[in-house]
């Protein structure tokens, strides 16, 4: 038996939010004025336990899931997270176990995560410009901390990271080229993400959206872009 979506496409990916806390306050995700931004989070007893998460993963693997993404909040804030990764990675049938993180805590955990069986890491980084980064992160964290986290991941053996960048007009769009250039020959993949409407929590404004076509043109004007074939059925990202 395989689980499918409403278009009858097989669902191979499972995304699990292991907690709602975060050490940053990104304006498009957890702005300071939101409940989470003000420090109002779920009590620990209301979060899925390690055993419950492991049980759910096993159930979904039996239904055809092969890839598991661990997200938050910031997953590395969860006590015992490395041990949770170890338990999930031991489940037969999982071909890809990934983490999405802001990378600030990676220097402490990267080697242990690699040893525990984590396969990939996606890092959220919206700008290399310190002022822009701090503005978008709610005046928390630094670019240096994120880059140190990326370096720690590389040294631990994570050779191909994904760098997620949410692009907003007149906020960080003017810094995109520097970020793309920084990672261009690194072996990592930069993913430019349009500012998405997720309700009124992140104060979404259409005027802040930079269409992907505009970004492609700016990048292509400096470096030739060639489309890359999709890697899986139903994939929505366009690769170059």
Task: Identify the residue ranges that each predicted region occupies.
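A C-terminal junction/extension of Radical SAM enzymes
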Residues: 172-176, 185, 189-240
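A generic structural signal for secondary-structure junctions
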Residues: 31-34, 118, 137-141, 220, ...
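A short, flexible beta-alpha/helix-coil linker loop
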Residues: 34-37, 128-130, 197-200
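Residue-level signal for pocket-adjacent positions within structured domains
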Residues: 2, 43, 128-131, 205, ...
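Short glycine-enriched, charge-decorated loop/helix-capping segments at active-site entrances
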Residues: 39-47, 134-141, 204-207
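Residues that line or immediately flank small-molecule/substrate-binding pockets and catalytic motifs
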Residues: 33, 72, 101, 125, ...
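Conserved alpha-helical substructure of the radical SAM core
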Residues: 1-72, 76-95
